[in-house]
Structures are given as C-alpha cells and as structure tokens.
Design a protein with these regions (language model features):
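Generic hydrophobic, amphipathic alpha-helix propensity
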Residues: 22-23, 70-75
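Alpha-helical bundle regulatory/interaction domains
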Residues: 1-35, 39-51, 56-65, 79-104, ...
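DNA-recognition helix of C2H2 zinc fingers
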Residues: 107
Length: 129
C-alpha cells in the first residue's frame, strides 16, 4: 500500500552511517574523559552537532537515551576495572575514576545494572568472596 521511495531508503542509510559515526565519537570521548563528569552539551560541541542530534543517534543505534548510554558506559568501565581485582583499587577509587562522585548513586546504579554490589565483584576478583 505505502512504499518507501528509493530516496528515503538512501537517506536512511546515510543517516544510519552518520549516527553510527556519532556513537563511535561518543565512545571515544567517554573513554578519554572517563574520570570527569560528562555533560551532553560538551559532548555535542565536541562532535559538532546538537544535543538533540546526539540523543537521536544514540536512540537509533543503541535503543536508549543519551544519558542512560553514558551512564552504562561508565558503569561497564568501572566493572572492567573491578573485575581485574587489583590490590591497589578500591570501590570508591574506581567509582571516582569513572566519573561517579556520589557513592550512594554509584552503589545503586551498579547493583541495578549487575545485580550485585561493586564490593562483591571486587572481592570475587581477588578471590576473597
């Protein structure tokens, strides 16, 4: 009944490629600025687009909001450090190194994402669980 025009298919693919490129730029920015708070406006300026465009790109490519995506990137980075089980790392230092400055918020988000406290992840990695 309704057919997509060839033009809309091509523009959709171009948009998808540019959205994927933006998400890669976000990933690089987050990795480089892991210890700092990440603000959408700064990220958008760095990528040369609006905050809305960043949000649309993340929603299109990752299926979630920009804010949620950024938080999950930080949480996964923290988990990767905790899983290594280094004696030099604490949960607090790991949280701060990944942009979390409110330990209660970090604890709540970590438990919600990984179904265990960060301290248990670290203890298991060290073999003391």
């Amino acid at each position: 009944m309704f057919r997509r025009s060839r033009k809309s298919e091509i523009s959709g693919r171009i948009a998808s490629k540019s959205y994927c490129r933006l998400v890669r730029m976000i990933d690089e920015y987050v990795a480089y600025h892991a210890a700092s708070p990440i603000y959408s406006a700064d990220l958008a300026e760095q990528c040369g687009v609006s905050v809305r465009t960043l949000g649309t790109a993340v929603a299109s490519v990752r299926g979630m909001s920009l804010h949620r995506y950024l938080r999950l990137k930080q949480l996964w980075s923290a988990r990767a450090q905790l899983v290594k089980g280094s004696d030099a790392i604490t949960v607090t230092s790991c949280a701060r190194a990944n942009g979390f400055h409110h330990m209660g918020e970090f604890a709540r988000l970590y438990r919600a994402a990984f179904h265990e406290p960060a301290s248990r992840t670290l203890a298991r990695a060290r073999g003391t669980d």
